[in-house]
Amino acid sequence: MAKLALINREEKRRKLVEKFAAKRAALVAQVKDTKLSEEERMAARLALQQLPRNANPTRGRNRCSLTGRPRGVFRKFGLCRNKLREIAFRGEVPGMTKASW
């Protein structure tokens, strides 16, 4: 089980990403717009740099919803491989069967 502080930190990052998503997208569009003058684009770059670092979606980490484990997480289920295996063997995941060939 991951420390509760790490799980809370990820949740805080997720909220910051949501909060600044629209502003961030607008600034990125201004930076990429070649029709604007260099001064306007530079001002947009500086404004983008002033946003909180954790407002960047790439800083987020997928974690298991049961254990908080950061590695081996299946996006479709939101579970780490260990817990997904346990749940699948109990038959709680519809349509999932053990592979045989």
UniProtKB/Swiss-Prot annotation:
One of its GO terms (biological process) is translation. Belongs to the universal ribosomal protein uS14 family. One of its GO terms (cellular component) is small ribosomal subunit. Pfam families: Ribosomal_S14. Gene3D superfamilies: 1.10.287.1480. Keywords: Ribonucleoprotein, Ribosomal protein, RNA-binding, rRNA-binding. Binds 16S rRNA, required for the assembly of 30S particles and may also be responsible for determining the conformation of the 16S rRNA at the A site. PANTHER family: 30S RIBOSOMAL PROTEIN S14, SMALL RIBOSOMAL SUBUNIT PROTEIN US14M. One of its GO terms (molecular function) is structural constituent of ribosome. It comes from Azoarcus sp. (strain BH72). Part of the 30S ribosomal subunit. Contacts proteins S3 and S10. This is Small ribosomal subunit protein uS14. InterPro entries: Ribosomal_uS14, Ribosomal_uS14_bac/plastid, Ribosomal_uS14_CS.
